[in-house]
């Protein structure tokens, strides 16, 4: 009787309450820890400032960026990337979505102490701008090519990038969607080399989507007739992009092909920085996605060696790659090889 009374008094469970998000877990978004400190940064509610706060007290510590004080050519900031030394930041605006995780934007370099701001590059189509570990350089992708800059001089690392043919440093649609990432390059530990994945999708078949006025944001140019977006989309069983690995030596300006074995129809689903300047970690996977291998590759010689092999009965989840941690002497790897997700130390 008592249990029945409690159940009757409880809130009614219906479809609306289930789908409204009322039972979703609470979590914090929009904060970024500042490396080497006990602070985190966040964008103000009006988008006009980037502010630092104390983890211990939750109180505001400093205004790192202010649109008006910096005399920035923008009304608000949409995102930012702090430099590892905490002295500068990248801020971006005018972002436009490409696919689920990727976007193009106009980036600016802001010096926090001097309160000066300058454009990262010309145009509004820069992608995945990333600081080198020593905070001296920034790598980014524009028009499917990789560029590096120190804030004064811009160097174009690749020149063969072309829409629907060759992509450098960012994943094609399949990689972004299936492996849940939007940056396919990585600095080495001291910023003297940059490694990346190159996607040759010239032989992949094209798929076309119709575009309508009622999209968000509204596309008024399609009021009378729909538009069309055509891109390389390999259906199940069809050819994927042909992938290869490359590195760029910041001192010599030379590029080098990296020798990391992979099946003819296999994947390079991640490339990551390690604490060792002579090593990048490259992940490989077979087409069935049930066998993953990690290789340590030297960006200066191109040679590699296998360090981990992960095989599972069904398929390897993308969080295994995204949430693995590469340390100085060990690698922490999530795995559900026995049916349950555990952490394994190598």
Residue ranges of predicted features:
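Bacterial N-terminal signal peptides
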Residues: 1-4
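Boundary at the C-terminal end of the N-terminal hydrophobic targeting segment
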Residues: 9-11
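Predominantly five- to eight-bladed beta-propeller fold
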Residues: 15, 21, 58-60, 94-99, ...
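Conserved beta-propeller blade repeats
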Residues: 24-43, 70-89, 107, 123-139, ...
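Beta-propeller domains
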Residues: 42-69, 97-100
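Structural motif
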Residues: 47-53, 99-106, 143-147, 203-210, ...
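Short loop/turn segments that connect beta-strands within beta-propeller blades
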Residues: 55-58, 111-115, 150-153, 160, ...
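Beta-propeller fold detector
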Residues: 60-67, 118-121, 154-167, 256-259, ...
């Amino acid at each position: 009787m008592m249990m029945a009374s409690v159940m009757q008094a409880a809130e009614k469970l219906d479809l609306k309450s289930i789908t409204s998000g009322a039972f979703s877990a609470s979590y914090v978004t929009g904060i970024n820890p500042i490396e080497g400190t006990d602070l985190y940064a966040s964008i103000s509610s009006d988008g006009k400032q980037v502010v630092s706060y104390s983890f211990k007290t939750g109180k505001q510590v400093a205004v790192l960026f202010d649109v008006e004080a910096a005399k920035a050519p923008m009304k608000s900031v949409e995102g930012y990337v702090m430099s590892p030394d905490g002295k500068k930041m990248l801020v971006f605006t005018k972002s436009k979505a490409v696919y689920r995780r990727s976007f193009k934007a106009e980036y600016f370099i802001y010096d926090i102490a001097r309160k000066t701001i300058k454009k990262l590059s010309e145009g509004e189509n820069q992608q995945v701008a990333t600081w080198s570990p020593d905070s001296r350089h920034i790598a980014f992708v524009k028009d499917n090519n990789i560029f590096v800059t120190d804030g004064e001089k811009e160097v174009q690392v690749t020149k063969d990038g072309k829409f629907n043919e060759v992509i450098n440093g960012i994943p094609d649609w399949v990689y972004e969607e299936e492996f849940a990432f939007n940056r396919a390059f990585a600095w080495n530990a001291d910023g003297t080399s940059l490694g990346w994945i190159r996607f040759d999708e010239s032989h992949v078949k094209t798929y076309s989507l119709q575009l309508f006025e009622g999209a968000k944001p509204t596309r008024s140019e399609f009021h009378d007739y729909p538009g069309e977006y055509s891109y390389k989309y390999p259906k199940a069983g069809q050819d994927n992009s042909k992938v290869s690995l490359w590195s760029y030596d910041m001192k010599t300006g030379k590029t080098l092909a990296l020798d990391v074995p992979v099946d003819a129809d296999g994947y390079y689903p991640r490339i990551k920085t390690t604490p060792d300047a002579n090593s990048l970690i490259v992940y490989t996977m077979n087409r069935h996605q049930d066998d993953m291998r990690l290789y340590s590759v030297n960006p200066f010689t191109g040679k590699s060696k296998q360090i981990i092999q992960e095989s599972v009965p069904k398929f390897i989840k993308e969080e295994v790659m995204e949430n693995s941690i590469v340390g100085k002497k060990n690698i922490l790897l999530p795995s559900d090889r026995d049916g349950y997700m555990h952490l394994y130390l190598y």
